[in-house]
Regions:
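Basic nucleic-acid-binding interfaces
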Residues: 1-21, 31-64
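Minor-groove-contacting beta-hairpin "wing" of winged helix-turn-helix DNA-binding domains
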Residues: 26-30
Length: 64
């Protein structure tokens, strides 16, 4: 079962990403190390597989 967008947002915030807003259902996150990510979708929607992969990849980049 796919995870929800709100779970991905929570995971990004725990990893140190800050939400800088966005238009509509888009959210722009940035880490202090300069890693950026745009996540789209309403919090209650299911996350697409590519979104889950992208979040994992960006969190790994921020930990290096």
């Amino acid at each position: 079962m796919p995870r929800k967008i709100r779970e991905l947002i929570r995971e990004l915030e725990r990893a140190g990403f800050v939400n800088h807003g966005g238009k509509g259902d888009h959210r722009n996150f940035e880490h202090a190390k300069g890693v950026r990510l745009t996540l789209s979708g309403q919090p209650g929607n299911d996350a697409k597989p590519y979104q889950e992969r992208e979040v994992r990849k960006k969190i790994q980049e921020s930990n290096q």
